[in-house]
Amino acid sequence: MPFKETCPVEERIALFRDYDTGLFTLAELAARHGVSRETAYVWKRRRETGEARWFDDRSRAPGHCPHRTAPDQLAAILALRRRFPMFGPKKLKARLGMEHAGVPWPAASTIGDILKREGLIAAQPRRRRPVAHGEIPAGPDCLNGEWATDFKGWFRTRDGRRCDPLTLTDTASRFLIDTRIIAPTQEGVRAVLEQAFRAYGLPDAIRSDNGAPFGSTGGGGLSRLAVWWLRLGIEPRYIPPGSPQHNGRHERMHRTLKAETSKPAASDACEQQARFDTFRQRYNEERPHEALGQTTPASHWQPSGRPYPDRIEEPWYDADHQLRRVRSQGEIKWRGELVFIGEALIGEQVGIAELENGDHIVRFCTRDLGVIDHRFCFLRFAPPRARLRAAPEPAVTAQH
């Protein structure tokens, strides 16, 4: 036999219906209905007020909550969210602190609750962190100690044309130096980098993948672009193939760039470039970065103290090195034999030093290219090559 269910409202009405008969005291009825005598008297006083729905439960919420978000702060939070629809609670709180210094704003968790309540944020499943395989080298802490560059994955603008954005950042400050639509060639990349070098000076190193146009399968893994970097005193740093986590800071910026500029894509390359320019300004000057203590990259960034030279000097080698000029076919003349070094080094001067075993190591600037053995074979040092991709389509370059 099921338990008998009772309704508190019906119990209160029944209690006072019996009380009105005059046959029972309020204490007796309270005991019969399983409530305290004090509770029964509370309901008796409420009934005597003449209120129509005296038997209903009342809200137990406090009449005043000192921690409730003030209406003007609530309006400011929602207005800022409309200005920056991609900002989460932490960045909104940081941005509010920048724009209204000295004002105590709600915690980021409270701002998140406000956004959920207003339907401005959807609950998302927690993403599992990928397990890192091997050590991921951290970037330098000094400004311009390392820049990172890469092509964000290509996409098509609404007119059907292909768009290849090249991005360039300072690793330490996260400052986005440039985002430019160019052809994915050595000439296109060099033009953008030279403009950045002239405007902001030279970094100590540049991190990139080892695919074209940044790297090659030649000696030392160098491309013509990397040879130019070495002559400028910039160290090329290649991440392992298929390991984007080794350029994680740059890849994280790409995710934000994609969300804010290419979903959906612009109508043509010129409009898309305008979006990239706007994003760069907001990313550097308005968007707080959690790794920077919720400050902006622009508040940390300073140009390099190494200016772009008017004339690039020849490489310097120790006195124990013999010098050779790489010929037009990528070869050097060594002890009467032609030894192929690499087409990326055509016209460049390399240094050759003898090793203890009688072989000879070939160097260009600070990079070891490979070894010439006793058979006059050049055994080149090169990072592993990423898997081959299909030939790229003709790219669109935004005209300014």
Tell where the protein language model's regions lie, with residue ranges.
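C-terminal, beta-rich DNA-binding module of retroviral/retroelements integrases
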Residues: N284-H400
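Acidic/histidine-rich, metal-coordinating catalytic segments
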Residues: P184, F197-G218, P240-G242, N247, ...
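Mobile genetic element proteins and their domesticated derivatives, centered on retroelements
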Residues: L15, L29, A40, E51, ...
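Charged alpha-helix within mobile-element recombinases
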Residues: G218, R224-P309, G351, L355-E356
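Short, Lys/Arg-enriched anionic-surface-contact patches
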Residues: M1-A14, G63-P71
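Mobile-element integrase/transposase regions
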Residues: R68, D72, S109, L115-F175, ...
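Basic, flexible linker segments flanking DNA-binding modules
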Residues: R45, A52-A148, W154, A212, ...
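Short, amphipathic alpha-helical "recognition" segments used to contact nucleic acids or chromatin
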Residues: C7-F24, L74-R83
